[in-house]
Swiss-Prot record:
Keyword set, alphabetical order: Cytoplasm, DNA damage, DNA repair, Methyltransferase, Transferase
Thermal activity profile: Activity is stable at 90 degrees Celsius for at least 30 minutes.
InterPro entries (UniProt xref): DNA_protcyst_Mta_Thcoc, MethylDNA_cys_MeTrfase_AS, MethylDNA_cys_MeTrfase_DNA-bd, MethylDNA_cys_MeTrfase_DNAb, MGMT, MGMT_N, MGMT_N_sf, WH-like_DNA-bd_sf
Reactions that this protein is recorded to catalyse: a 6-O-methyl-2'-deoxyguanosine in DNA + L-cysteinyl-[protein] = S-methyl-L-cysteinyl-[protein] + a 2'-deoxyguanosine in DNA; a 4-O-methyl-thymidine in DNA + L-cysteinyl-[protein] = a thymidine in DNA + S-methyl-L-cysteinyl-[protein]
GO MF annotation terms: methylated-DNA-[protein]-cysteine S-methyltransferase activity
Organism, as annotated: Thermococcus kodakarensis (strain ATCC BAA-918 / JCM 12380 / KOD1) (Pyrococcus kodakaraensis (strain KOD1))
Known role: Involved in the cellular defense against the biological effects of O6-methylguanine (O6-MeG) and O4-methylthymine (O4-MeT) in DNA. Repairs the methylated nucleobase in DNA by stoichiometrically transferring the methyl group to a cysteine residue in the enzyme. This is a suicide reaction: the enzyme is irreversibly inactivated.
Name under which the protein is recorded: Methylated-DNA--protein-cysteine methyltransferase
Family: Belongs to the MGMT family.
Extra information: This enzyme catalyzes only one turnover and therefore is not strictly catalytic. According to one definition, an enzyme is a biocatalyst that acts repeatedly and over many reaction cycles.
């Protein structure tokens, strides 16, 4: 199922779409509905390739509102972990997502290298897991930055800056 809602954060419109079947299978967000729908279809395709059965039939749910509450800081990221299905996610990716969500709190960042050290792996492996994160905002991949700048973000650098600024992050270099 798919549930989509539009929210406002200050002057910015934010669209949030959640794919679910019992639990959350994937999350997408964008600043306009057209981009959101493209991201939802890309996410559904990615999950489908990983063996996840997806339905994009529209059905209202409270999931977009909950993701929005995480976005604006009214709901802690880690408290939302139990809502995620982790279908189509490798054991390594799940480990990375859970560690990041539980340990890198709102308003802070961690470098790819430091996250890799914490998990005894390589920065490249961490970067790959971040790129494939099906739960943006909730699993805060936007909080993972390069040692010399903001780094990459699948949804776009403008979106990453927006998320960090909402959380009060002023600088993202070490």
């Amino acid at each position: 199922m798919l549930s989509v809602e539009k929210f406002r954060v200050g002057e910015r419109v934010v669209w949030i779409g959640v794919i679910f079947s019992g639990r959350v299978q994937g999350i997408a967000f964008a600043f306009d509905r057209g981009t959101l729908m493209k991201r939802i279809h890309d996410l559904a395709e990615h999950l489908g390739k990983r063996g996840v059965s997806i339905s994009l039939d529209v059905q209202p749910s409270d999931y977009p509102e909950k993701v929005f509450k995480v976005l604006i800081g009214e709901l802690d990221n880690a408290s939302f972990l139990r809502e995620l299905s982790f279908e189509g996610v490798t054991p390594f990716e799940k480990k990375v997502y859970e560690w990041l969500t539980k340990n890198v709190k709102r308003g802070s960042v961690i470098t790819y290298g430091d996250l890799a050290k914490a998990l005894n792996t390589s920065p490249r492996a961490v970067g790959g897991a971040m790129k494939r994160n099906p739960y943006p905002i909730v699993v805060p991949c936007h909080r993972v930055v390069a040692h010399d700048g903001i780094g990459y973000y699948s949804s776009g650098i403008e979106e990453k800056k927006f998320l960090l600024e909402i959380e009060g992050v002023k600088e993202w270099t070490s």
